[in-house]
Amino acid sequence: MTRLLASLLFGLGLLSSLPAFAAERTITLAVQNMDCAECPFVVKKSLQAVPGVGRVAVSYKDKTATVTYDDSEADLGALTGATTNAGYPSAPKS
C-alpha cells in the first residue's frame, strides 16, 4: 500500500511539471500597403518565417492574411511584427 501511494504521488509530481499543451490558433490579419501582385508573396513569406506558424493564406483582393500558428511558439505580436518589418503593417481584422 505504501509503495502504491508513493508511486501515485511520484506520477502526479511528474504530471504537474509538464508544460501546458499548446493550442493551434487561427487569426485573420488586415494587411496594409498591399498594392501590387507581388505583395501577397512577400507577406506570406514573412509570416512563414515566424517560428510556430503552420499555414498562411494571403488574399490580395481582401487585403488579409489568415494564419494558423502554435500559440506556444508564436503570438500576435510576432505575426504583426513580421508583416510590419516586411513593409506591410497589419492588425487583427475586426
Task: Show which residues each predicted segment covers.
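C-terminal structural segments of small proteins and small subunits
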Residues: 72, 76-90
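Cleavable N-terminal signal peptides
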Residues: 3, 8-10, 20
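N-terminal compositionally biased, intrinsically disordered segments and leader/signal-like regions
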Residues: 3, 29, 84-85
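N-terminal targeting signals for Sec/Tat export/insertion, comprising classic cleavable signal peptides
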Residues: 27-74, 78
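Secondary-structure boundary/capping motif
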Residues: 22-25, 62, 86
